[in-house]
């Protein structure tokens, strides 16, 4: 019996080893090396590295450029998280009922999510630039009333955020629709028999039942926004005057334009810690939803 168990365990280990080796080679080893680099003064391809302790972390947390990128990322995250959640929830509520061609509408709203973020960014740069300028010229709008969507410090970040909302709202719409379909029909039927209208059903039944889904989507959006790189890089390259430079873009500039590999890695570790906290919160909310 014990010999059979040993053989069975050997088979299990044989199946696990390839995945474990892959995980160690492509995740654990690079992370350990990155963690070590964050404590050194590594510069570009220079093989010489010296241990500097927490100097890179202190510099990052006191550097105005990094703190500015962090604040830009927080504003971008708040805008996109709120906008995408509201848009996705509104679309889900509209397309969950008896709507003609609702499957077609769901596919249409989900389609932008299948497109590359770089392509989406270039399309919206063209809309903000060429199409908008052509429309302004056609309508003879005074220059004082014209909007510089990506050239104004106050508007560039939110123009970029609107692009992100347009691209991702369809994905979160499907998650909300799945949550709405899990709500028992008996609850809505009982509310209808009691005379509850559509708004009362949404406010008192659907939204409370969707609270775990809303929380999960919020955290997923926050994680995605903190990692955003493609949209600011493709649309504005961080401009104007750093108004759209996110943490990920700041790390890229530090590593590949300034060649300060150790310092950039320390910034990456800080970003990793922020995302890890948000990921832990996601798992906690998922477990809470399953328990309920």
Each PLM stretch: what is its role?
Residues 4-292:
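A structural signal for multi-pass alpha-helical bundles of membrane permease subunits
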